[in-house]
Regions:
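Residues forming the flavin
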Residues: 1-367
Length: 367
């Protein structure tokens, strides 16, 4: 039987939320173990080359990969933080034991508190031949280009005009790839105007109320058929277009990766505003399973800026519940809550606020 690893706070997921949680908890004095399934922490940050918005505290003006490197360095230089990479958590059990697999070994951890920061996965959509080589999720395209330096093709159709679709389209243009167009099923663009304006200035059409009806090609993508949608989201006959492309990139949203929350018997609820099933929690991010916190996209899909603040809040609350930071934790917690309110104050954030209000649970957090 494997030896059990005793730790005060276990953080599952080394993306923006997980790294921020680790730093915050360790800064208050808690001993932290962070588990990341990839060979390097950072999550989505390592492939983001665009500059962040917000305040200086949310790293405004810095690029995603720079923020990721900074958070990784903070974890690596803090003696209170231990990081296991290339390790996958398998389960959270009734007795509090967490099992994981890493480098061919079966591992057991017995944490006092758990923060789940597993992020989200890309959604896909159904259309004929959507399994052809050359059809990618937007995150995969970012990884190919910004991590490995490989362009996915020469002519791209982007599906989805949210922030991810707009940002990845611009990054494709910067890499010398032609973006023949961006289509969006909704009648309005979901992403920020600043991103859409850059795309339009580059001459890329953004077609709202449009969808893909079929991809085609012999051994890989050679083209796509698209059409316009009416107010009932039905195809309008005679509006079909045939676009010659070798890549179709899907940026149609994310789904919270909540499998561990389900398995840990957290009370869950489907909330469309938060992009799927998410755990009930209180404002301090503690779920209905006492001692288990959530942060980042696993608690509802938002921007990375919000994920980092949520991670910081979860780390503070988990550490405080163990008796750390009695002199400063409440002040830090109040500051983090205020930052989240500020980030969610705009029109885009109101959707998130509406979703969160459906979830609020009294919980048992000591913050």
């Amino acid at each position: 039987m494997p030896k059990v690893k005793e730790i005060e706070i276990l953080i599952i997921g080394g993306g923006p939320a997980g790294l921020s949680a680790a730093v915050a908890a360790a800064d208050l004095g808690a001993n932290v173990l962070l588990i990341e399934r990839d060979d390097k922490p950072g999550g989505q940050l390592v492939k983001q080359t665009h500059k962040f918005f917000g305040s200086k505290k949310q790293y405004a003006g810095d690029r995603g990969y720079q923020i990721g490197n900074f958070l990784i360095e903070q974890c690596e230089t803090n003696p209170k933080v231990e990081v296991w990479t290339e390790t996958t958590v398998l389960g959270i059990y009734e007795d509090g034991v967490v099992t994981a697999e890493g480098q061919g070994k079966h591992l057991k951890i017995n944490p006092e508190k758990i923060i789940v920061a597993t992020g989200a996965s890309e959604k896909m959509i159904a259309f004929p031949n959507n399994d052809l080589p050359g059809i990618y999720g937007a995150g995969a395209v970012q990884t190919l280009m910004n991590v490995h330096g490989i362009v996915p093709g020469q002519r791209v159709l982007m599906i989805g005009a949210g922030n991810i679709g707009l940002i990845v389209s611009y990054q494709l243009l910067q890499a010398g790839v032609e973006v023949v167009g961006i289509i969006e099923a909704s009648p309005t663009i979901g992403g920020y105007l600043v991103h859409a304006s850059k795309i339009r200035r580059a001459g890329v059409p953004i077609l709202t109320s449009h969808t893909i009806t079929e991809a085609y090609g012999q051994d890989s993508v050679e083209g796509a058929l698209i059409c316009q949608l009416d107010e009932k989201w039905q195809p309008i006959p005679g509006t079909e277009q045939d676009l010659k492309v070798d890549v179709i990139c899907l940026a149609v949203g994310l789904s919270p990766l909540t499998e561990l929350c389900f398995q840990a018997d957290c009370q869950m609820k489907f909330v469309p505003e938060l992009s799927g099933h998410v755990p009930l929690r209180n404002k301090y991010l503690e779920t209905t399973r006492l001692g288990l916190y959530v942060a980042g996209d696993v608690s509802g899909v938002e921007e990375a800026s919000s994920a980092m603040v949520e991670g910081r809040l979860a780390g503070i609350c988990a550490a405080y519940s163990l008796g750390y930071g009695n002199d400063v934790a409440l002040k830090l917690q109040t500051e983090a809550l205020a930052e989240l309110s500020e980030l969610r104050a705009g029109p885009a954030g109101q959707k998130t606020v509406k979703g969160i209000m459906k979830l609020m649970d009294k919980g048992g957090a000591t913050c």
